[in-house]
Amino acid sequence: MKRVILLSILLFTAGVIRSELASATEVGTSRQFGLGVQLFEPTAFIGKLFLDRNDAIDFGVGFWGYGRCYNNNGPYACSNGNQYFSLHFDYLYEEPIVDTVVRLDWHVGAGGRMAFNSYYNGDGRHDAALFARVPIGLDLTFRRPHWLEAYLEIAPGLWILPPLAFDIDVGLGVRAYF
């Protein structure tokens, strides 16, 4: 009897998961998971997973050697060739604007970014910074090829660690969907 109950629970759970994944693709699009690249701040390899028609998770891993440096005084402009590593993760809500020859969506979300310096800055340790951000952007999906998306995103936010400071991330990128 316990095996029957356990098997029923497992089958029910698998059915719910399958229907949730299917709902992301049954809304008139075959895209659910995309990978790509983003230029500017942060320059990154990026991914996006649709949870349903309007909700998605966006993430990225970036490396760069220009732009902003981070220390105990907050972000500052630099061009000294130091290398930085960045991780970002956002929840996005999307709505279509145009859905004709191309599909144009706008999105807004909430998330964060961590940046790590890879150099010694004189204070006895490598620095890390934490950024709370609100990404706002446009996503352009082509009908042919239907698996390609281009986007522009602006993400104003606050550096929480080190000391509080306002900053804006700007990204221009492309994704291929599978």
Regions found by a protein language model. Give the residues of each.
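Transmembrane beta-strand segments of Gram-negative outer membrane beta-barrel proteins
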Residues: 29-39, 106-112
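Solvent-exposed loop/turn segments connecting transmembrane beta-strands
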Residues: 33-49, 63-69, 81-83, 158-167
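Outer-membrane beta-barrel "beta-signal"
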Residues: 166-178
